[in-house]
Amino acid sequence: MEFPGGNDNYLTITGPSHPFLSGAETFHTPSLGDEEFEIPPISLDSDPSLAVSDVVAHFDDLADPSSSQDGSFSAQYGVQTLDMPVGMTHGLMEQGGGLLSGGLTMDLDHSIGTQYSANPPVTIDVPMTDMTSGLMGHSQLTTIDQSELSSQLGLSLGGGTILPPAQSPEDRLSTTPSPTNSLHEDGVDDFRRQLPAQKTVVVETGKKQKAPKKRKKKDPNEPQKPVSAYALFFRDTQAAIKGQNPNATFGEVSKIVASMWDSLGEEQKQVYKRKTEAAKKEYLKALAAYKDNQECQATVETVELDPVPQSQTPSPPPVTTADPASPAPASTESPALSPCIVVNSTLSSYVANQAFSGPGGQPNITKLIITKQMLPSSITMSQGGMVTVIPATVVTSRGLQLGQTSTATIQPSQQAQIATRSVLQAAAAAAASMQLPPPRLQPPPLQQMPQPPTQQQVTILQQPPPLQAMQQPPPQKVRINLQQQPPPLQSKIVPPPALKMQATVLPPTVESSPEQPMNSSPEAHTVEATSPETICEMIADVVPEVESPSQMDVELVSGSPVTLSPQPRCVRSGCENPPVISKDWDNEYCSNECVVKHCRDVFLAWVASRNPNSVVLVK
């Protein structure tokens, strides 16, 4: 064969120990008869990137040191014993020689002239007429793609896999008694021997070095594990043995202690075992406390609250009122329900709603727990340890709702809704009472609601029939996306006489149209409390008038807690006297004076809700 670039570039294929291989003889194919075949020249394009030195250098690692100068090429095809000349085109040579390198032991009876590109998949047609006992000898023409070559033969079309060097013809042919019969047997045996090795090479090239595992730094606050009973005995006896034998090594001391432990009585061993058991119990307690502390400092934690018995009356959070344009404050949670402060300052909107899981009324609350050092400036702490979160973009659709557990679930909402209300509504637990002062018409506005004591108890004494407040159109929920800081909460509170209220369950809700003025008194706007099962609301003294049954008395209440009284009281706010039986006021008032004062308060509240900018004086 002749390569371009010079007349001296002839490849001499020799086999010194084989009688058929010599440079001066033509090649004979024993399997096909005595026909003579001329070796066709390989015509290569004048590609500057491909030279004879590159082809030969690629097979240098596959050649045997004892072969001749051009033995690298013969070593490549030495496994095939060169029964037939193999014609390769320029497209096959461009693959870097990785396709048939290192001992593909199939006898190729026809020249492979298929052009190959670097883009997979590539189909290779290999005639296998003479390989009857080979790997795929059942088919005369087998289609092999790139993935099969890579997985079964360990070959790579890109030439990236380095295969082990093939056995030289001298080593293989020297032990062959009959060259005619051993041509195919040697090829099949070599193929089977090299197949596992090639697979191993492919697997090894795909492995990545694993990074060494870094040991976690041990927390100094983590409790230490207790030692065993033998370790306690070792500590006790080591000092005595060292005192007697100061030159004894650690191994000698260990042997002495082991013999002493074996000869120790069972009762004495039980003493050390009891110490170990006690230490284990202390360790488990300390470990549990340590884990609880770690979980408390986690970023997000889902907690399932235990159901509160119906007989108990939990303390409700502070009752607040909000203007329509101002957001309702986020729900507050008592420290008795959670050891950590619950706050969510990253969400742009909240929906305060209580979800009950199952008929048992057991709520599931998802809480974001943040340490006290990370609390933002928008959080104000009350004296009772409660936290009120008022983010800049908090809006609610269902408002502040309080159930049997006096907690509210904070849930994110992409587009929250705010509904204005014309009647003071707030959730409360049953079987409790609370005195709160009614509002005056124009007191100085407060920038933030003062937090009442945490142990307030609220009840409702009377519930009117469901009605639309102020005879206005049906309520509508207005969607608001607050992009800027909303105005601060404003409320108007004055100390008036006390108000007596009763507790009841409200099947309906009293709503009003969102057409109320923005600067109206805050008692006309509050947050609705709803739940899937029950509706507990605190409506401050709602009593229908004789002239207009739709008129309602709305009062903002905030004051000190009062004790529960089983006896009924006068309905008028601030009156502690029991009601007098009379058909004129339905056994609800103690005197005519209370009836007149109560009607005046109701009328003033109604006028204020209708005309918030006007001042009405009733004498």
Swiss-Prot record:
Provide the alphabetized UniProt keywords: Chromosome, DNA-binding, Methylation, Nucleus, Phosphoprotein, Transcription, Transcription regulation
State where composition is biased (Low complexity).
320-335
Name the CDD domains on file. HMG-box_TOX-like
In alphabetical order, the GO MF annotations are: chromatin DNA binding
UniProt KW Ribonucleoprotein keyword:
no
Function per UniProt: Transcription factor that modulates cell fate reprogramming from the somatic state to the pluripotent and neuronal fate. In liver, controls the expression of hormone-regulated gluconeogenic genes such as G6PC1 and PCK1. This regulation is independent of the insulin receptor activation. Also acts as a regulatory component of protein phosphatase 1 (PP1) complexes. Component of the PNUTS-PP1 protein phosphatase complex, a PP1 complex that regulates RNA polymerase II transcription pause-release.
Q: What is this protein called?
A: TOX high mobility group box family member 4
Subunit structure of this chain's protein: Component of the PNUTS-PP1 phosphatase complex, composed of PPP1R10/PNUTS, TOX4, WDR82 and PPP1CA or PPP1CB or PPP1CC. Interacts with PPP1R10/PNUTS. Interacts with FOXO1 and CREB1 (increased by cAMP); FOXO1 and CREB1 are required for full induction of TOX4-dependent activity and the interactions are inhibited by insulin.
Matching InterPro entries, A to Z?
A: HMG_box_dom, HMG_box_dom_sf, TOX_HMG-box_domain
Output the lineage of the source organism: Eukaryota, Metazoa, Chordata, Craniata, Vertebrata
Question: Mind naming one GO cellular-component term on file for this protein?
Answer: chromosome, telomeric region
Residue list for modification Phosphothreonine: T176, T313
The gene for this chain is: Tox4
Q: Where is this region: Disordered?
A: 155-227, 304-335, 436-458
**DNA-binding region of this protein:** 223-291
- What residues bear Asymmetric dimethylarginine in this entry? R479
- Its chief place of residence is nucleus
